[in-house]
């Protein structure tokens, strides 16, 4: 069974605080866990994060979405899959729901397409080949 928990919400609503509290609790009951964030969590994903968060960049909505998805793919393949295989809890600061909220509803991209792309990532997480 995957132990993958995502925390979603607007900026500064307490996601990081709740993740840290849950991680400390899991540590106290001897449950292995890791904390990851989107975008980020790997060297490549952190570089993508810098591009996305740079206010000087005027990124169109499609490029922005593809960068977020690229960061997610890297995180899944470098970190999340390995943690699933080790039966660790994965505590993730944002994931696919943020894509729907920000790129779908916020930027007006096609929700059906975003849902299909998000499904691909859940498949990727559970496919160990």
Show where each model-derived region lies:
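Hydrophobic anchor at the beta1->P-loop junction of P-loop NTPases
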Residues: 4-7
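Walker A (P-loop) phosphate-binding loop of P-loop NTPases
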Residues: 12
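Conserved lysine of the Walker
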Residues: 15
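Hydrophobic positions on the alpha1 helix immediately C-terminal to the Walker A/P-loop
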Residues: 18, 22
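Rossmann-fold NAD(P)-dependent oxidoreductase module
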Residues: 25
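Short glycine-/polar-rich loops that comprise or flank the Walker A/P-loop
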Residues: 29-31, 124-129
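ATP-dependent small-molecule kinase phosphotransfer cores
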Residues: 31-122
């Amino acid at each position: 069974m995957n132990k993958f928990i995502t925390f979603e919400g607007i900026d500064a609503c307490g996601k990081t605080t709740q993740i840290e509290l849950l991680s400390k609790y899991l540590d106290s009951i001897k449950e292995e866990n890791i904390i990851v964030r989107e975008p980020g969590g790997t060297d490549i994903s952190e570089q993508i994060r810098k591009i996305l968060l740079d206010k000087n960049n005027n990124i169109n909505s499609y490029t922005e979405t593809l960068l977020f998805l690229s960061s997610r793919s890297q995180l899944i393949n470098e970190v999340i899959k390995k943690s699933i295989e080790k039966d660790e809890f994965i505590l993730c600061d944002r994931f696919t729901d943020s894509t729907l909220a920000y790129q779908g509803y916020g930027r007006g991209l096609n929700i059906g397409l975003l849902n299909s792309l998000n499904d691909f990532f859940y498949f990727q997480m559970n496919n160990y080949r």
